[in-house]
Amino acid sequence: MVNLFPVFTLIVIITILITTRELSTTMLIVSLVTDYIIINTQYTEQQHEMNTFSTQQLPQKNSFNESYNKDKKSNTHIPYQWLAPELKEAENKYWWGNYDPYSEPVLAGAS
C-alpha cells in the first residue's frame, strides 16, 4: 500500500514553487522538503533493518550466552542516583581510592 501523503505534499510544494517569486521562500521550502525526505527515508530504513533482524535471526539459547548476559554490567544510561555507589565501588577497586602519599617510604638522602 502506497502512502499518498508525500506525493500530495510534493504536488503542493511544486505549485507553491511555481507561484512564488522570492528566492528565500523557495529555498526555505526546498530545505524543508529535503529534510522531510531524508528523515523519512532514514526512519523507514531503520524500521526495515529492525524488522528483518527480528524475523530472520532468533536468539539461540545456551548456557554461555545466558551467564554472560547475567554477569555483564551495563555501562550506558546510568541514572544519577545510582552513580554514587558506582563511584564508591571504583574507590575501593582502583589506585585513587586507597592511595596515601604519606604512607610511602621516604628515600634516604632525598631533599
Swiss-Prot record:
Membrane topology: Single-pass membrane protein
Main location: virion
Keywords: Glycoprotein, Late protein, Membrane, Transmembrane, Transmembrane helix, Virion
UniProt entry tagged with the keyword Secreted: no
Induction or repression: Expressed in the late phase of the viral replicative cycle.
TM segment ranges: 10-32
Coiled-coil parts of chain: none
Gene Ontology cellular component list: membrane; virion membrane
Residues with attached carbohydrate: N65
Subcellular location: Virion membrane
Family that this chain belongs to: Belongs to the asfivirus H108R family.
Name of this protein: Inner membrane protein H108R
